[in-house]
């Protein structure tokens, strides 16, 4: 009956959303069990539980809602129902369970006792006390029995444990009684109801089945269950194990007994999470929490408040799937567990939603054995949904509710209020554990368990985290959201405030404006009215009455009238508008103090005040004074004598201190004199002093040698300078002197050159139109082109490599030729052909031979001076010395690029120039003189230079420009060999190589010298030379020669299939250099080489391999590159390169001729020497270095030279210097010390001179610009050139060097000037180094070789065009372009001699230069640049005072002060209105 009633009540109360059926089932079990409890709790529920139920409703489980309907009944039912519709039944079930004493029977064991309470969890006492049913005592005993007998787990056997669990559960339950404390007895009133609910909610009560417990999980689950928090965990465990069993066994009666524990046990593991959540709320909650994790979806929420609440969360899963099947699924699991454990629990789940079946299962028979079907399954479903909806609402009630939710009893608790809650707690635990644990037993622990967590901190039903969402996270989220909203709100408020203020301000302004306009109008109107009154009046009067009167009278009358009126004050108009507030007046003076007021009368005597209260007792008075001293008492009797004292005898005293010592005794008498000792041994002889260091060798010595040469240096002046003496050797060159005339012709040649330039001009245009245009010129060389192909092979860079390897060793020189190959492009400069005349000088080249002999720098000196003068005047002239290379002249074509390469090392510019030498090619005939170059044997020393030859050659490259002088060079030839050594070397090496070296003559360019200096202070010399070369004064010379070469360069570039620019000139120079290095002889005779010969050479495998290596860097397969090469073009280029460079195997001679043009070598040298520009001589050196190696260089390694040259940045200068080269050889020795010394001593003046000279426009253009020309080859592709250079440097130290410098300098800026400066270094040389250092495109270091340059994709033609334009602009190309170009390259080597000279006897050179300058004055360079503004002079003294000025006009009278006036005005205005 109770159950039924309960159900009814539940139904009524629960009816909320849940189905009545649920209600019925859920409570039924419980009520029967604890009818009392049911009645009591339920009824209580109505009262106290009402709230609980309400909470239930809030939870949103229909069950709960129902429970709301009937407070107590509902509460417990709700829980159950919550779990499932059957949850309502569940309470019954738990009841039944409780009733069921045998755990085996879920229904009966726990029904009576358990049902009432939530589950075993309510302590028996609790049950008894809590349940109104009167189950309390009985219940408790019942529970004990059940626990002991029915709980499979040993845990439950302990009554105390059970009690504790129950209490804990209860405490956990919603009821306010202890939350989770073991002793938490739910209020008895509440408890009963709760109990009922619990029983129903938890199968536990009803389905306490011992077997289930045993089978599933022992009661141990309950243990967990009982404690609100921990029991849940345990429940879960039990549930997990029990879940299937529980489900299977409808009667979780055993669980019922301790509904809580059982429920817990039945709870699936999944439930555990849920339970834990719920556990936090109450024991009941725990039950809820126990809903499996799966349950936690749904259950989590339910657990939060009660079974009901739990249901809510469960609703998502538990409800639908949970009860019946999902042992695993959260909700389901819980449901299953609950069912198994406790029908109620299951029902709870079901109640949640879904499993009506389960609910039925859950509903167990009461103790009576009735099984309550979960007819309210439908209710459960509904409940669940509602629960979900209401869950949040119920949050507030969660605490209390939880209890009810946890167990069916909770529902009861609801009815009962707190007490009910407590009971529910117990159940809750059980239910949670059982998985049915949800809020109320009836609700269905599972559902409740799942939702249990929902209680406080449980996540909403819809939360995927289910039980794992902690309330604080939600809270935090809400807080943050609120904060954000508040922030926005405040922001908006602030904004609104601002807007309001602005509006107010605007309104205020508007009002003010309105007021002002109004005032104005008023004023105006008042004025009008005042003025208008009389007139109108007059008119009227006149017309009406006064017509007859005299107007005068009328007016008189009016006046009198008005006056009287005014006096009477009748005319006063209406008050005008209020005037504007006047400006605040000044503050008044402080007033005088007022007179003191009269004293007021005396006041009346006040009435007597009331009598005061009695005073407090006064403080005790102070202590009285001390009394008098008492009299002394009488003396006492005498004391008796004391006993005799006794003591032991004392120890003996210490001995006294020793007495003071007596006075000293009288001194003894003097002893007899000792005998004389034996004579001492004689001292050893001192060590010999350290031998003094050998004094430094006087530089003069070397000069002495040169002195001999001096004689040769018929050149009187040079002769004076020891150097000139050396020049004397050149005396042979002196013979060249005639060539000197040639040199004059050179000038003519220059004119010719200009002519050439004209020609060049054509090329220039071509260049402009299409970089190809330049290439076009090369086209003519087409024949050589054929060789070109082989060149390609060479190109691969094998030569480069060779050069590289040789660079350090010996014939790096060949390498340089490779670069000249680049010059090939210069070939077009063929125009330089005119230079050919220089070729004549080439004949002089033989004289050059003496130059060789001239080892003495003198000889080269003179030639160098010639070169310089030539450069200054006719570059060709100086080149004359290079002339020796002239023989290679045939190589004239070479001019194009090869020379450039040579130049490259010394000066990038030259590389270009060599091209021009092409014209010298004709001189090639002179080529034979080239052999004279052999004479240059001196050069041989150069040969040693040869070793450094590579350097020398490279250096020579720069000289290349001088090459043109090459013709003169013939004489120079010999000279060259001397200096260049390289030339000599080549001669030695073979006609072809010697020829190549012959070009060396240009080497003269002292550059080599620098190398010598390298040994001692290469850097200094490099610096000097580079500075010097850059100086404007010397630049003209250098530029003159070098410039020309540039043009040729352009042709070099060619665009490859890949679209990359390919520099045939460069390639040609590479190939030539490679061939030379490899000792291969092109053609049968050194004088004439046909393009076919070259082509044949190019076809050689080794050459192809070399080319392939050279080209590889480009990234394209070397093979393809080779295939894509136009061998004809390459051979032409090579031919032109060789001819221009004089490198051609033996063709070099031609270049020499160009050298002739220009001042004679000796002149130049002497000029330079005289002008302190020895540095200049030196610069040529770079080319020279190669030569130097031979004689003086023996002490200098090629690497040193090359590095020096590269660092020196002499490459650009090289060209002109070349001539000096011959002397170079000697120089080297000197170089080490002398140059260094000189540099050290005269570094400033030397540098300044050099700089001034080199920086002179002419020189600069030459050095920077002209050299650029060599660059021209580079021009085709600036980068490429650079690359090429680097490639050269890589391939051969000397070759690479020369090539690098020459190209790099010319290329550096892509212009004539650019070249010399190069981006990396001051000069080509520097640049070359730069390359190595990655200064320029990193070709050098980067394995750039051609590849890099190609990668750069430079357009050589374009570059050539630019360079040529630049040269033309500077007038560099006029005579020298061609001359310089080819041949000079070779001559470069001679350059070294110049340097050598400087090196060997720097002082000599200095003297020579100085003499020269003294005699001729500084080399006339272009006018110096405008000096910097002088420092402002000191401020002059103050001058005498000037006469007084005229008297000024009288000033106008000042305006009257405004203030007064304004005040007046204001007043008047004020009156006006």
UniProtKB/Swiss-Prot annotation:
Necessary for interaction with DST and for the recruitment of DST to hemidesmosome: region residues: 146-231
Keywords for this protein: Basement membrane, Cell junction, Collagen, Disulfide bond, Extracellular matrix, Glycoprotein, Hydroxylation, Membrane, Repeat, Secreted, Signal-anchor, Transmembrane, Transmembrane helix
Membrane topology qualifier: Single-pass type II membrane protein
Record-level GO cellular component terms: basement membrane; collagen trimer; collagen-containing extracellular matrix; extracellular space; hemidesmosome; membrane
Biological process according to GO: hemidesmosome assembly
Pfam family name, one: Collagen
Compositionally biased region (Pro residues): 814-835, 878-899, 913-922, 1001-1011, 1179-1188, 1214-1228, 1266-1275
Glycosylation site residues: 1404
InterPro entries, A to Z: Collagen, Collagen_superfamily
Positions of the UniProt region annotated as Nonhelical region (NC1): 1460-1473
Sequence ranges on the Cytoplasmic membrane side: 1-474
Biased composition annotated in UniProt, kind: Basic residues: 1463-1473
Region Triple-helical region, residue ranges: 573-1459
Regions of compositional bias (Basic and acidic residues) in chain numbering: 1-19, 1449-1458
Segments traversing the membrane: 475-495
Post-translational events: The intracellular/endo domain is disulfide-linked. Prolines at the third position of the tripeptide repeating unit (G-X-Y) are hydroxylated in some or all of the chains.
Low complexity: bias regions: 619-638, 667-678, 729-742, 769-790, 837-847, 854-866, 940-957, 1283-1307
GO molecular function: extracellular matrix structural constituent conferring tensile strength
Major place of residence: other
Nonhelical region (NC16), as annotated region: 1-572
Composition bias type Polar residues, residue spans: 57-96, 111-120, 170-184, 1198-1210
Physiological role: May play a role in the integrity of hemidesmosome and the attachment of basal keratinocytes to the underlying basement membrane.
Subunit structure: Homotrimers of alpha 1(XVII)chains. Interacts (via cytoplasmic region) with ITGB4 (via cytoplasmic region). Interacts (via cytoplasmic region) with DST (via N-terminus). Interacts (via N-terminus) with PLEC. Interacts (via cytoplasmic region) with DSP.
Name used for this protein in its record: Collagen alpha-1(XVII) chain
Species assigned in the record: Bos taurus
């Amino acid at each position: 009956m109770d159950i039924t009633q309960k159900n009814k009540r539940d139904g009524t109360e629960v009816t909320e959303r849940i189905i009545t059926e649920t209600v019925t089932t859920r409570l039924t079990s419980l009520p029967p069990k604890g009818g009392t409890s049911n009645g009591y709790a339920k009824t209580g529920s109505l009262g106290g539980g009402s709230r609980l139920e309400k909470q239930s409703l809030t939870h949103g489980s229909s069950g709960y809602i129902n429970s709301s309907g009937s407070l107590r009944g509902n509460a417990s039912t709700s829980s159950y129902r919550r779990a499932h519709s059957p949850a309502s039944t569940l309470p019954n079930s738990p009841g039944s369970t409780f009733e069921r004493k045998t755990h085996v029977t879920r229904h009966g064991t726990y029904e009576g006792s358990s049902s009432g309470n939530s589950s075993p969890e309510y302590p028996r006492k609790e049950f008894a006390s809590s349940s109104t049913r009167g189950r309390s005592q009985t219940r408790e005993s019942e529970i004990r029995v059940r626990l002991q007998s029915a709980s499979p787990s040993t845990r439950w056997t302990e009554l105390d444990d059970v009690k504790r669990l129950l209490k804990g559960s209860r405490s956990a339950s919603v009821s306010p009684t202890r939350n989770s404390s073991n002793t938490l007895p739910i209020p008895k009133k509440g408890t009963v109801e709760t109990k009922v609910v619990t029983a129903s909610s938890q199968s536990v009560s009803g389905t306490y089945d011992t077997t289930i417990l045993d089978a599933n999980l022992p009661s141990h689950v309950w243990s967990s269950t009982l404690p609100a928090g921990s029991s849940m965990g345990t429940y879960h465990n039990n549930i997990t194990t029990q879940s299937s069993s529980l489900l299977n066994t409808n009667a979780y009666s055993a669980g019922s007994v301790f509904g809580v524990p059982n429920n817990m046990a039945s709870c699936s593991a999944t439930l555990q999470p849920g339970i834990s959540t719920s556990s936090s709320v109450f024991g009941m909650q725990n039950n809820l929490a126990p809903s499996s994790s799966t349950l936690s979806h749904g259950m989590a929420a339910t657990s939060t408040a009660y079974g009901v609440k739990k249901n809510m969360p469960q609703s998502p899963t538990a409800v639908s799937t949970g009860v019946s099947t999902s042992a695993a699924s959260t909700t389901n699991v819980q449901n299953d567990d609950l069912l198994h454990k406790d029908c109620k629990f299951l029902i709870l789940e079901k109640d949640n939603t879904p499993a009506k079946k389960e609910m039925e299962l859950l509903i167990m028979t009461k103790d009576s054995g009735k099984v309550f079907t979960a007819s309210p399954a439908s209710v459960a479903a509904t409940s669940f949904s509602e629960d979900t909806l209401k869950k949040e609402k119920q949050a507030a009630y969660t605490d209390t509710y939880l209890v009810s939710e946890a167990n069916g009893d909770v529902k009861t608790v609801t009815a009962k209020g707190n007490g009910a809650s407590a009971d529910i707690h117990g159940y809750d635990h059980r239910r949670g554990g059982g998985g049915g644990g949800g809020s109320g037993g009836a609700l269905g622990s599972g559902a409740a368990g799942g939702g249990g967590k929902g209680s406080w901190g449980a996540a909403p039903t819809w939360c995927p985290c289910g039980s794992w969402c902690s309330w604080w996270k939600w809270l935090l989220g809400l807080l943050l959201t609120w904060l954000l909203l508040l922030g926005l709100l405040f922001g908006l408020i602030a904004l609104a405030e601002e807007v309001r203020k602005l509006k107010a301000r605007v309104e205020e302004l508007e009002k003010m404006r309105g007021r002002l306009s109004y005032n104005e109008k008023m004023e105006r109107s008042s004025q009008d009215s005042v003025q208008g009154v009389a007139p109108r009046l007059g008119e009227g009067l006149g017309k009406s009455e006064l017509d007859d009167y005299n107007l005068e009278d009328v007016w008189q009358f009016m006046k009198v009238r008005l006056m009287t009126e005014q006096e009477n004050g009748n005319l006063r108009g209406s008050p005008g508008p209020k005037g504007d507030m006047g400006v605040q007046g000044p503050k008044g003076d402080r007033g005088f103090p007022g007179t003191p007021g009269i004293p007021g009368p005396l006041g009346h005597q006040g009435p007597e005040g009331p009598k005061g209260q009695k005073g407090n007792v006064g403080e005790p008075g102070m202590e009285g004074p001390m009394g008098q001293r008492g009299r002394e008492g009488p003396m006492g009797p005498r004391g008796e004598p004391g006993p005799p004292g006794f003591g032991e005898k004392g120890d003996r005293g210490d001995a006294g201190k020793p007495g003071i010592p007596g006075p000293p005794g009288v001194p003894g008498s003097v002893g007899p004199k000792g005998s004389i000792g034996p004579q001492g041994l004689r001292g050893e002889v001192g060590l010999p002093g350290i031998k003094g260091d050998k004094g430094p060798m006087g530089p003069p010595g070397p000069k002495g040698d040169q002195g001999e040469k001096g004689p040769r240096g018929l050149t009187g002046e040079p002769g004076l300078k020891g150097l000139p003496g050396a020049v004397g050797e050149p005396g042979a060159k002196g013979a060249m002197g005639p060539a000197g005339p040639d040199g004059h012709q050179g000038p003519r040649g220059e004119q010719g050159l200009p002519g050439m330039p004209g020609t060049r001009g054509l090329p220039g245009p071509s260049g402009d139109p299409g970089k190809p245009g330049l290439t076009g010129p090369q086209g003519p060389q087409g024949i050589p082109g054929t060789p070109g192909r082989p060149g390609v092979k060479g190109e691969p860079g094998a030569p480069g490599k060779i050069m590289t390897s040789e660079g350090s060793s010996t014939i790096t020189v060949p390498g340089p030729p490779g670069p000249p190959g680049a010059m090939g492009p210069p070939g077009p400069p063929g125009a330089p052909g005119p230079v050919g005349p220089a070729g004549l000088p080439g004949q002089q080249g033989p004289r050059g031979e003496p130059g060789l002999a001239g080892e003495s720098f003198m000889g080269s000196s003179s030639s160098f001076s010639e070169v310089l003068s030539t450069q200054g005047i006719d570059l060709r002239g100086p080149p004359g010395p290079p002339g020796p290379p002239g023989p290679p002249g045939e190589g004239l074509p070479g001019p194009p690029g090869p020379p450039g390469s040579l130049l490259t090392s010394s000066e990038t510019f030259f590389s270009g120039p060599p091209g021009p030498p092409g014209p010298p090619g004709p001189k090639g005939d002179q080529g034979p003189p080239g052999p004279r170059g052999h004479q240059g044997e001196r050069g041989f020393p150069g040969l040693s230079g040869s070793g450094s030859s590579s350097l020398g050659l490279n250096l020579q490259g720069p000289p290349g420009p001088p090459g043109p002088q090459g013709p003169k060079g013939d004489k120079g030839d010999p000279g060259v060999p001397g200096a260049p050594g390289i030339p000599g070397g080549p001669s030695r090496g073979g006609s072809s190589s010697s020829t190549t070296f012959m070009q060396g003559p240009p080497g003269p360019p002292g550059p080599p010298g620098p190398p010598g200096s390298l040994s001692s202070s290469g850097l200094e010399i490099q610096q000097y030379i580079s500075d010097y070369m850059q100086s404007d004064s010397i630049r003209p010379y250098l530029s003159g020669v070098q410039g020309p070469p540039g043009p040729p360069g352009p042709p070099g570039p060619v665009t490859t299939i890949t679209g990359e620019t390919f520099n045939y000139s460069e390639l040609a120079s590479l190939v030539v250099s490679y061939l030379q290095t490899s000792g291969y002889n092109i053609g049968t005779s050194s004088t004439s080489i046909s393009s076919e010969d070259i082509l044949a050479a190019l076809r050689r495998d080794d050459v192809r391999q070399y080319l392939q290596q050279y080209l590889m860097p480009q990234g394209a397969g070397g093979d393809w590159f080779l295939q894509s090469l136009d061998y004809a073009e390459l051979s032409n280029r090579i031919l032109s390169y060789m001819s221009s460079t004089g490198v051609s195997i033996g063709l070099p001679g031609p270049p020499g001729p160009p050298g002739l043009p220009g001042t004679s070598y000796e002149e130049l040298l002497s000029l330079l020497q005289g002008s302190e520009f020895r540095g200049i001589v030196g610069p040529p050196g770079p080319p020279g270095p190669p030569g130097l190696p031979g004689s003086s260089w023996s002490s200098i390694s090629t690497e040193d030279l090359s590095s020096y040259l590269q660092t020196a940045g002499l490459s650009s200068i090289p060209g002109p210097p070349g001539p000096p080269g011959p002397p170079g050889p000697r120089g080297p020795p000197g170089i080490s010390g002398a140059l260094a010394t000189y540099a050290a001593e005269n570094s400033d003046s030397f540098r300044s001179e050099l700089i001034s000279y080199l920086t002179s426009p002419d020189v600069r253009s030459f050095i920077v610009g002209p050299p650029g020309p060599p660059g021209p080859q580079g021009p085709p592709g600036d980068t490429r050139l650079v690359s090429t250079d680097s490639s050269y440097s890589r391939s051969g130290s000397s070759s690479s060097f020369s090539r690098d410098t020459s190209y790099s300098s010319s290329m550096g800026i892509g212009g004539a000037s650019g070249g010399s400066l190069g981006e990396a270094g001051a000069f080509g040389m520097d640049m070359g180094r730069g390359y190595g250092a990655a200064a320029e495109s990193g070709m050098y270091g980067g394995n750039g070789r051609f590849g890099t340059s190609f990668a750069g994709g430079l357009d050589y033609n374009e570059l050539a065009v630019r360079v040529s334009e630049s040269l033309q602009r500077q007038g560099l190309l006029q005579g020298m372009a061609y001359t310089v170009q080819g041949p000079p390259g070779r001559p470069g080597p001679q350059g070294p001699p110049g340097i050598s000279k400087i090196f060997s006897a720097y002082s000599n050179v200095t003297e020579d230069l100085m003499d020269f300058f003294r005699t001729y004055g500084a080399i006339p360079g272009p006018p110096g640049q405008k000096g910097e503004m002088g420092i402002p002079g000191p401020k002059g003294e103050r001058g005498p005072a000037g006469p007084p000025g005229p008297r000024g006009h009288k000033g106008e009278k000042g305006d009257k002060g405004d203030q007064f006036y304004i005040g007046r005005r204001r007043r008047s205005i004020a009156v006006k209105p």
